[in-house]
Amino acid sequence: MAMNLPADNEGKIKLAMSILVTIINDTGVPRNIRRAAANALTHLRDPRLSPAVRAANAISALEEVSQDPNMPFYARTRIWQVITILETVRD
């Protein structure tokens, strides 16, 4: 199913943040994955940086755990979804 992305960077970041919050609140996801999602969320909320830099920092935090063998498949799909959304954020 195709997802319609918001046209503006802040809309994309808010969409990514909402997906990250669902991962953080899911107790079926291992703690290290939730911690990485929380770290990515912190990067996205940093007002001192431009949207593209915030997105790049969050992607970096998520890519470290995206191949974790203990991650449930649905969580991996959500992580990849967030990365895909954030890759479209440009300054």
UniProtKB/Swiss-Prot annotation:
Pfam families: UPF0147. InterPro entries: Ta0600-like_sf, UPF0147. SUPFAM superfamilies: Ta0600-like. Gene3D superfamilies: Ta0600-like. Transmembrane segments: none annotated. Belongs to the UPF0147 family. This is UPF0147 protein APE_2336a. It comes from Aeropyrum pernix (strain ATCC 700893 / DSM 11879 / JCM 9820 / NBRC 100138 / K1).
